[in-house]
Structure formats: C-alpha cells, structure tokens
UniProtKB/Swiss-Prot annotation:
Belongs to the CDPF1 family. InterPro entries: CDPF1, CDPF1_dom. It comes from the Eukaryota. The gene is CDPF1. Residues 115-124 have a biased composition (Basic residues). Residues 105-124 are annotated as: Disordered. It comes from Gallus gallus. This is Cysteine-rich DPF motif domain-containing protein 1.
C-alpha cells in the first residue's frame, strides 16, 4: 500500500450552534504527522486541504468544557479561555470570567448571528 495516501476521515464534526460540518481525521491533542505540536484541548482536526504539507492541519472545534456540546472555533460560536466554552455557556456564566472577556462579549452581542441561524433551522 502507498504510505503517502491521505488520511481517511474518522467521522464528521458538526457544530451544534451554527451547523458547520466537516470531515475530521483526528480527535485529541497531538495530531498525526506533527512533531512538536500539542493542542491545549482535545480537538476535532482535519488535514489542511489547501497545502500538500502533511504537518499542516485545521482545528475545526472541540467540546464545550461546561455543557459538552460540540462547537466550532468560530468567534460566533465559542471562545477559548484556558478551556473551550460555547457562547451560550459564556453568557450564562459571564460574571465568572475576567473583565476582559466580559467586555469582549459586550462588543460581540450585536454581531452574534449564531443563535439566530439556529432558530431559523427547525430541523436541528
């Protein structure tokens, strides 16, 4: 068999907030073919389709550390502050976050489209 073959997808990642779907090839903190990279959280990862370099990858998302729902890394759906948090959990627990995060969330509110998209799609 040819060892240079592309990795087969392990499954399909789906953000439970915005509905983004993409095939992932690895879940964890140390993606294959990377020598010195360790991700700070267990993440859904895919090989970067825009480069032939096997060491390049894209982080699709991970699980919210509070509610455990799968969320993408998009700013409309989650944030990383020592751990990954979905924006609904951040908003519910906003006072527990540092002032900088609280101020950042205040700036994001008028731009947040994630929850309005969710309401439009009654299938999920």
């Amino acid at each position: 068999m040819d060892s240079s073959k592309e990795p087969e997808p392990t499954g399909e990642f789906k953000c439970q907030l915005c509905g983004l779907t993409a095939p992932y090839t690895y879940y964890g903190q140390k993606p294959p073919n990377t020598h010195s990279i360790v991700i700070l959280e267990d993440s859904y990862v895919m090989k970067d389709p825009f480069t032939p370099d096997k060491e390049k990858f894209l982080i699709l998302g991970s699980l919210c550390s509070l509610c455990r729902r799968a969320v993408c890394v998009g700013a409309e759906c989650s944030l990383f502050y020592t751990k990954r948090f979905c924006l609904p959990c951040v908003n519910e627990n906003l006072q527990a976050f540092p002032l900088e995060i609280q101020e950042d969330m205040d700036k994001r509110k008028p731009q947040s489209k994630c929850l309005t998209r969710k309401k439009k799609d009654s299938r999920t």
